[in-house]
Swiss-Prot record:
Species of the source: Brucella abortus (strain 2308)
SUBUNIT field: Part of the essential Sec protein translocation apparatus which comprises SecA, SecYEG and auxiliary proteins SecDF-YajC and YidC.
Family, similarity comment: In the N-terminal section; belongs to the SecD/SecF family. SecD subfamily.
Membrane topology summary: Multi-pass membrane protein
Protein name: Protein translocase subunit SecDF
Lineage, top ranks: Bacteria, Pseudomonadati, Pseudomonadota, Alphaproteobacteria, Hyphomicrobiales
Biological processes, Gene Ontology terms: intracellular protein transmembrane transport; protein targeting; protein transport by the Sec complex
SUPFAM superfamilies xrefs: Multidrug efflux transporter AcrB transmembrane domain (SSF82866)
Function: Part of the Sec protein translocase complex. Interacts with the SecYEG preprotein conducting channel. SecDF uses the proton motive force (PMF) to complete protein translocation after the ATP-dependent function of SecA.
GO cellular component, one term: plasma membrane
């Protein structure tokens, strides 16, 4: 019913108003928000690292249990907060990994230095029974060992293995400038127990009676001529004030319980992030504008209502992201564009049903009511299949792909709400106020209103072509394979920007050769000032990838700024590869189960096979054109899985409906009629979704551009497969009407489309 009681209408408008209030801070500057009353919301959706700039690390905690992982994360968070890096993201991932994101910090090496130092502090007594040189050349005493200093070259000290003091005896550590010589020092504050032990150690009267050791390296070996009965002790060493402050914070926060290894490093400069942000916002706005204009031209006042609902959809989506504290990234923008496509698809389904029922002789009000009612199950099924792919991607994906999956999942919820309640409310108010005598005519036609195309006559041709194409792709995969990006093969990718003039690609190549870095490629970037350096996996462990990153900084930092740094070790690349394959498999399994539950096994199997066809063909595009296959490629494939199922479910839903009504009709005729009845929706939705991705391709970054291109091709392939693969497979699988189905009389239009009457 189009009727809404007052309280239902009030609740819907209240939900929209509350969402607008929650989302409103995102449309104002921070300075404007500061001047608003305190009772108004001021929380904004934060920008992700790819839009704001910053650094991201994936760290592996060795031999970590749950307690060690939590303790390590807390210590890392404390270190970053004390150093002034506000609101860092420090979260556990999996069984033994920690993800760290710090907006505004562009020196990833500094971040690694802060977080990978264990901070094991000890005071160790000197062993004067033999000289360090003799111990190095020979064998040190059983209870002693040689420990080297931070100096260059390092100096060896013969120290007792058992510490006199440890970090547990330290209550505070602060960096300052010495009043004596103006050099940076670290002042340690000891507790009472530590003070007594230090006094006992130095009471022996031996000069150089102890050394201060951090992570098994001597940082200071003070000369002591008498007992030290003090709670404060200064460490002097070869470090500047920043290094001293970093060390003080490390000592103050406590030692990490286990050693930490860097598995993945990603850094993006603020200027590049701002460029990405501007381009992403422009792409999203243009996508919404193009889609909205198309809907208005196609459906008149109903298109205007769809456009208003789309704006409300985006507002509610923004409000939810604000409430849960999510950040907006390039991936989120891509998810937003996909949400726009899903929302428009739902409206097209309803409006095409309305027009179909109006042609059958229904009144405008009856057609509106019937359109919403009959499109409901199709909309829900189509969106839930996409939701399955999004949830799998969220659970198995990593990094920015999480943002895409989260945005799509939330967007599906907001799309269902706005389409099935808010749009319906607006149409009800329009019908009640304007009392229209006719459904608005379509001003823009891509396909005829009614078609009678005999698709099933081509079933063997199309199935044969598709089988042959899939076989060719499989052969190419076996013999050539994907052009894997660093996400799946490991390695480094660095975007350099010349500090003066243009980037000299030849010079960069020569300098890389001098560094003895294997498998390095230098490519031109979007600007003549920039160059892209891609280095393959070193295949000797995660530390080797980090060594390459250090070499690059040391060689090029004076002449080039590092706009972007991505370093992925073999451990992470293997995990991402497994997760990518598993994500596709689980998506197909989940969708098969859902479609089987909602329909029948023939339809479930047909849907999965046609979707698998789309995955294979889309993969073939990556292989043939040697497009880089990375996490974005997996996201594109999973999105197309959802979109393909969306298309297929719409046709299958109509097949199911016609089978129930006309169980005596030949199955090929029913399938032909079902495809023709939904053809305008299929082509309109494909065209609108394709339009939505054009701005994303035009203005997105390189990865987003590849993603948009893959989706655009995937949309075409998915539309083809839903008509020429999924539908004919139902005949091959012997689909029949259920015995309990009751047939209705065949009206003239359906009889003509079913070819049951001449």
């Amino acid at each position: 019913m189009l009727y809404f009681s007052r309280w239902k209408s009030a609740l819907i408008w209240l939900a929209v108003l509350v969402s607008l209030i929650i989302a409103s801070p995102n449309f104002f500057s921070r300075e404007t928000l500061e001047n608003l009353p305190d009772f108004l919301p001021k929380k904004q959706v934060s920008l992700g690292l790819d839009l704001s700039g910053g650094s991201r690390l994936i760290l592996q905690v060795q031999n970590a249990g749950k307690t060690d992982l939590e303790t390590t994360a807390n210590i890392m968070r404390q270190r970053l907060e004390e150093l002034g890096y506000g609101n860092p993201v420090v979260e556990g991932e999996g069984r033994n990994q920690i993800r760290v994101e710090v907006p505004g910090l562009y020196d990833a090496q500094l971040l690694k230095d802060i977080l990978t130092i264990r901070g094991n502090l000890s005071f160790r007594a000197m062993d004067d029974t033999m000289s360090p040189d003799d111990a190095i050349r020979g064998t040190p005493p059983a209870d002693s060992e040689i420990v080297y200093s931070f100096d260059d070259p390092p100096v060896g000290y013969l120290l007792k293995k058992t510490p006199i003091l440890t970090g547990h005896d330290i209550t505070d550590a602060k960096a300052s400038i010495s009043a004596d010589d103006g050099q940076p020092v670290i002042t340690l504050t000891l507790d009472d127990n530590g003070r007594r032990r230090l006094a006992d150690l130095t009471a022996q009267g031996n000069e150089n009676s102890f050394a201060i050791v951090v992570d098994n390296q001597v940082v200071s070996a003070p000369t002591v001529s008498g007992p030290l009965d003090t709670s404060e002790l200064q460490i002097e060493g070869a470090f500047d004030l920043q290094a001293a402050n970093n060390m003080a914070v490390v000592l103050r926060s406590g030692a990490l319980p286990q050693a930490v290894t860097v598995l993945e490093e990603r850094t993006i400069a603020s200027a590049l992030g701002e460029d990405y942000a501007s381009a992403a916002v422009l792409a999203a706005l243009l996508a919404a504008l193009v889609v909205g204009l198309f809907m208005v031209l196609s459906y008149g006042i109903l298109g205007v209502i769809a456009l208003v609902a789309l704006v409300v959809n985006i507002v509610i989506l923004t409000a939810v992201l604000s409430l849960i504290g999510a950040s907006i990234s390039l991936a989120s923008i891509a998810g937003l564009v996909l949400t726009i496509g899903l929302a428009v698809d739902a409206h097209i389904l309803i409006y095409e049903r309305v027009r179909e029922d109006r042609r059958k002789g229904y009144s405008v009000v009856q057609a509106m009511e019937s359109g919403f009612y009959r499109a409901l199950s199709t909309i829900v099924d189509a969106n839930l299949t996409t939701l399955i792919a999004a949830l799998v991607l969220f659970l198995l994906g990593s990094g920015t792909v999480h943002g895409f999956a989260l945005t799509v999942a939330i967007g599906i919820g907001t799309t269902l709400f706005t389409t099935l309640t808010f749009t319906r409310l607006l149409i009800a108010q329009w019908v009640r106020t304007a009392k229209p005598k006719e459904v608005p005519k379509r001003r823009l036609k891509l396909v005829p209103t009614v078609t009678h195309i005999p698709f099933m006559r081509l079933q063997f041709v199309t199935l044969g072509i598709s089988v042959l194409a899939c076989a060719i792709v499989v052969a190419l995969f076996v013999n050539i394979g994907f052009n894997y990006g660093i996400d799946f093969r490991g390695g480094s990718m660095v975007e350099l920007q010349a500090r003066n003039g243009d980037a000299n690609l030849e010079d960069i190549n020569e300098r890389l050769a001098e560094l003895n870095i294997d498998s390095a490629r230098v490519l031109p970037a979007k600007s003549p000032r920039s160059a892209l350096v891609i280095i393959g996996s070193q295949e000797v462990g995660d530390d080797a990838e980090q060594t390459v990153a250090v070499k690059l900084r040391g060689e090029f930092e004076q002449d080039y700024s590092f706009q972007r740094v991505d370093v992925v070790g073999p451990t992470v690349s293997e995990q991402l590869s497994r997760a990518g394959v598993l994500a596709v498999i689980l998506s197909l399994i989940g969708i098969f189960i859902y479609v089987w539950f909602r329909f029948r096994w023939q339809l479930a199997l047909g849907a999965v096979l046609s979707t698998l066809h789309d995955v294979v063909i889309l993969s073939g595009m990556f292989i043939v054109f040697r497009m880089e296959f990375n996490l974005w490629s997996v996201a594109a494939i999973l999105t197309i899985i959802g979109y393909s199922l969306n298309d297929t479910v719409v046709i299958y839903d109509r097949v199911r409906e016609n089978l129930r009504r006309y169980k005596s009709a030949p199955l090929p005729a029913i399938i032909d009629a079902s495809i023709n009845q939904t053809l305008s929706r299929t082509l309109l939705t494909s065209f609108v979704t394709f339009l939505a991705h054009v701005p994303l391709y035009a203005f997105g970054g390189s990865e987003i551009r590849m993603f948009a291109l893959a989706l655009s091709v995937g949309i075409i392939v998915a539309s083809y497969s839903s008509i020429f693969i999924a539908a004919p497979l139902l005949v091959q699988f012997g689909l029949k009407p259920r015995e309990t189905d009751a047939g209705d009389a065949v009206d003239a239009e359906l009889a003509q489309s079913l070819n049951l009457e001449s």
